[in-house]
């Protein structure tokens, strides 16, 4: 449910026309995902699917201002400043705010510069906060394994002390474990294979999440030469840095940090596991926290031109192209982990280009789109000597669509995607390919098929 009040207007500032916008908003969001009884009970052929339900409310206020600074000066046909501020009070994440500062510098009818600096936030979603605990039967290592045994001297003494302060673990460690296969008693606290296999865990939401925050810089140049009518060229640079990105914290990390803490057992990480009466692990818990960092930068070059006169051929031809060149795409899981730049990996190719050729008349439209992906590596973290084993060549796909307008409100269309029937890359040694030795998944190259795809339809 949303209720909002907005106001806009113009005013005179030093003889120049400025404009403003302001408003308030009240928003209430509620979401739920209710699996059927079989899924809830885990009787549908898989693990239990949990119930997700949650809600939050937010009160927001914003203001925007657009102010021309100068007009009709040499090399400054117009310079305009814009700014915006917004503050939101979330019932979950608390108070967050966002700011924006921008400038537009029109040199003349042909050239314009633009730039924006902004700080923005993303509050956690209902899924982030309230997602139900889904069960997993993945085992994790127990940092207490080995205490009281022959290897205890090589263990972290803080971990040993914390583990033995649990009377359940201490009692089991003192007794040892009888190994039937070897017919011996293994000293200390250890696990048999069946005990390892009984460990299971749960992953879900975290109601204590905070907001993600982003700093964004964009700089752009627009060139629309008056002496070449119909031509438009834009070049934009972008840089985005996001802090406190919500990502899942592993159960192994949580339990290790618990027993390495000098605040055991009161450290918050210690609530992420439970044990049997014997001291052996029973359940682990994993959830999202604000821990990661993401940084990306690059360039977008767009060119468009319209041929309005095709001579004896009716209609007009519009050509639009955009090239994205990635400069960096860095992801850091935690503040103590090593950042990795993934530019050049499949899905984050150095260059991606799309060119559209569109011919139109009063009734017809024919569009041919080319999609280009530069060569890439399956895994940029691999050893350089293995690059040739996991290299994926550059790829180009062609898509065709034909549309005919039967009336002003009804049209029929026919299309062929992947016109040349080009198969996805084949990389038998790629470790990021979920089916080793097979074609790369469609998702990596924006495809949902492995061959030519035809479709037909109508709209009204």
Task: Report the location of each language-model feature.
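Residues that define the transmembrane beta-barrel architecture of outer-membrane proteins
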Residues: 55-61, 95-99, 203, 213-217, ...
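Gram-negative outer-membrane beta-barrel transporters
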Residues: 232-380
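C-terminal beta-signal and adjacent terminal beta-strands/loops
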Residues: 327, 370-381, 403-460
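Structural signature of Gram-negative outer-membrane beta-barrels, strongest in the C-terminal barrel
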Residues: 49-153, 162-165, 199-228, 238-240, ...
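Short loop/turn motifs that connect adjacent beta-strands in outer-membrane beta-barrel proteins
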Residues: 10-18, 70-79, 110, 152-156, ...
């Amino acid at each position: 449910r949303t209720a909002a009040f907005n106001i806009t207007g113009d005013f005179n500032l030093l003889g120049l026309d400025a404009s403003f916008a302001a408003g308030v908003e009240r928003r209430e969001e509620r979401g739920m995902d209710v699996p059927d009884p079989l899924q809830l009970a885990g009787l549908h052929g898989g693990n239990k699917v949990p119930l997700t339900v949650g809600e939050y409310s937010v009160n927001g206020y914003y203001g925007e201002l657009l102010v021309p600074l100068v007009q009709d000066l040499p090399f400054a046909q117009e310079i305009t400043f814009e700014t915006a501020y917004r503050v939101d009070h979330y019932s979950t994440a608390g108070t967050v705010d966002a700011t924006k500062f921008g400038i537009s510098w029109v040199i003349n009818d042909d050239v314009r510069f633009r730039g924006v600096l902004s700080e923005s936030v993303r509050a956690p979603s209902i899924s982030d906060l309230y997602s139900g605990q889904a069960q997993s039967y993945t085992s994790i290592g127990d940092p207490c394994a080995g205490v009281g045994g022959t290897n205890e001297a090589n263990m972290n003494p803080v971990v040993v002390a914390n583990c033995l302060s649990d009377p359940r673990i201490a009692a089991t460690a003192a007794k040892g474990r009888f190994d039937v296969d070897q017919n011996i008693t293994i000293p200390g606290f250890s696990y048999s294979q069946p005990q390892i296999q009984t460990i299971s865990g749960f992953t879900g939401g975290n109601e204590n999440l905070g907001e993600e925050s982003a700093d964004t810089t964009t700089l752009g140049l627009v060139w629309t030469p008056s002496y070449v009518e119909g031509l438009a060229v834009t070049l934009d640079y972008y840089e985005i840095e996001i802090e406190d990105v919500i990502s899942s914290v592993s159960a192994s990390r949580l339990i290790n940090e618990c027993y390495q803490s000098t605040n055991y057992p009161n450290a918050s990480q210690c609530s992420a596991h439970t044990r049997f009466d014997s001291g052996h692990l029973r359940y682990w818990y994993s959830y999202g926290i604000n821990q990661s960092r993401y940084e990306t930068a690059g360039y977008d070059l767009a060119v468009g031109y319209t041929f309005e006169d095709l001579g004896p051929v009716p209609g007009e031809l519009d050509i639009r192209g955009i090239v994205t060149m990635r400069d960096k795409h860095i992801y850091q899981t935690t503040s103590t982990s090593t950042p990795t730049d993934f530019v050049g990996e499949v899905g984050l190719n150095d260059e991606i280009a799309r060119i559209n050729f569109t011919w139109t008349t009063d009734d017809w439209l024919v569009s041919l789109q080319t999609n280009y992906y530069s060569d890439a590596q399956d895994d940029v973290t691999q050893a350089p000597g293995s690059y040739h084993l996991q290299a994926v060549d550059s790829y180009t796909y062609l898509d065709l669509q034909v549309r005919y307008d039967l009336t002003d409100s009804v049209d029929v269309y026919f299309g062929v995607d992947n016109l040349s029937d080009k198969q996805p890359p084949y990389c038998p040694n790629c470790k990021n390919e979920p089916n080793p030795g097979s074609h790369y998944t469609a998702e990596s190259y924006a495809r949902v098929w492995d061959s030519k795809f035809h479709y037909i339809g109508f709209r009204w």
